A protein has these predicted regions:
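Solvent-exposed loop/turn segments connecting transmembrane beta-strands
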Residues: 37-45, 73-79, 106-114, 191-199, ...
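Transmembrane beta-strand segments of Gram-negative outer membrane beta-barrel proteins
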Residues: 23-37, 60-64, 184-186
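Repeated loop/turn-to-beta-strand initiation elements of outer-membrane beta-barrel proteins
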Residues: 59-63, 95-98, 130-134, 178-184, ...
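Outer-membrane beta-barrel "beta-signal"
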Residues: 119, 205-212, 234-247
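Transmembrane beta-strands of outer-membrane beta-barrel pores
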Residues: 35-39, 57, 68-72, 102-108, ...
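Residues that define the transmembrane beta-barrel architecture of outer-membrane proteins
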Residues: 27, 43-47, 78-82, 114-118, ...
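Membrane-embedded beta-strand positions of outer-membrane beta-barrel proteins
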Residues: 31-33, 64-66, 100, 120, ...
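Residue-level signature of outer-membrane beta-barrel architecture
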Residues: 22, 35-37, 53-55, 90, ...
Length: 247
C-alpha cells in the first residue's frame, strides 16, 4: 500500500506527455467523470473519475495520471480499482524522446493486491500531422506483482505471494480528428515479463460540446496472460464520460 500511495503522489505532482502531439502548452490535460458496465472477473455497473495533466518546459516534460472506478450491487462491492502513473520525458528532437516511468495499480477483483512498474525507454512520434498523430514507446524496467491470497476450496488455500521480474514495456497512442469537433483515439499498452503479460487497449470517440466540455464513449479491454487461479484472463469495460479539457 505504501508503494501505491507513493505512485499516486508522484502521479499527482509529476505531469507531462509521453507523446507530443500538438505544439506544447505549459499546462494541458483533462478531468473526467464516467459511468459504465464492466464484464469479466466482475459483472457490474460502476462509476469513476480520472485526471490527466502534463507540463512542459523547454525540452523537459512531466506527466501524471490518476484514475479510479467503483461499483456496488445490492450493498455488495463489485468493483474497486485505482491506478496512478508518473512520467518524465526529455525531448531529443521534434519526434524522438527519452523517458522514465513509474506506475501502480490496485484492483480488488483482479487476483492481485497491487502491481507496480518502474522503467526507462525511448518514444518516437511516427505521424505528426494536424489531424492525425501516432506515437510509439518502448522500454525496460522492473515489475512487481503482489498476488492476493486465494481460497480455492474449503480445504485448499493458496497464500499470498510476491513476483518480481524484469519487464518490457511498449505503448501506442493514435489520434485522428474526424472533424473540428470529433476525434477518434486508440491507445494500447503492453507490459511483458517472464511471469505474465498485461495488455490493454482503449478505443474512444470524443465529441466537443461547448467550451472545454466534451462527451466521450469508450471501450476498454484488458488481458492477463497468466491470471491467478480462479480468475479470468480478460475484462472489458464500456464507459460514457463527461470530460473537461484543461489548456
Amino acid at each position: 500500500m505504501k508503494n501505491l500511495l507513493a505512485a499516486v503522489a508522484l502521479a499527482a505532482t509529476c505531469i507531462a506527455p509521453a507523446f507530443a502531439q500538438d505544439p506544447p502548452k505549459e499546462w494541458t490535460g483533462e478531468g473526467a467523470f464516467n459511468a459504465g458496465v464492466t464484464q469479466g472477473n466482475t459483472h457490474t455497473t460502476d462509476i469513476g473519475a480520472g485526471l490527466k495533466l502534463k507540463h512542459t518546459a523547454g525540452q523537459w516534460a512531466e506527466s501524471g495520471e490518476l484514475s479510479g472506478d467503483y461499483g456496488k450491487i445490492d450493498g455488495v462491492e463489485t468493483k474497486n480499482r485505482i491506478f496512478a502513473a508518473g512520467q518524465v520525458d526529455y525531448l531529443i528532437n521534434d519526434r524522438l524522446s527519452a523517458y522514465g516511468r513509474v506506475s501502480g495499480e490496485k484492483d480488488d477483483f483482479s487476483g492481485f493486491d497491487a502491481r507496480y512498474f518502474a522503467g526507462v525507454g525511448i518514444g518516437y512520434q511516427v505521424i505528426k500531422q494536424d489531424n492525425m498523430q501516432w506515437g510509439l514507446q518502448g522500454g525496460v524496467g522492473y515489475k512487481v506483482d503482489k498476488v492476493a491470497e486465494r481460497i480455492v476450496s474449503p480445504t485448499v488455500r493458496i497464500p499470498k505471494s510476491t513476483e518480481e521480474s524484469v519487464g518490457v514495456q511498449a505503448a501506442s497512442r493514435f489520434k485522428y480528428k474526424i472533424n473540428d469537433k470529433v476525434a477518434l483515439t486508440n491507445d494500447t499498452d503492453i507490459l511483458y515479463s517472464d511471469t505474465s503479460t498485461q495488455t490493454r487497449n482503449v478505443v474512444a470517440l470524443t465529441v466537443d460540446l461547448m467550451g472545454n466540455l466534451q462527451a466521450r464513449v469508450s471501450y476498454d479491454i484488458r488481458n492477463e496472460s497468466n491470471p491467478p487461479v480462479g480468475f479470468k484472463a480478460t475484462d472489458t469495460a464500456t464507459k460514457f464520460s463527461l470530460v473537461y479539457k484543461i489548456g
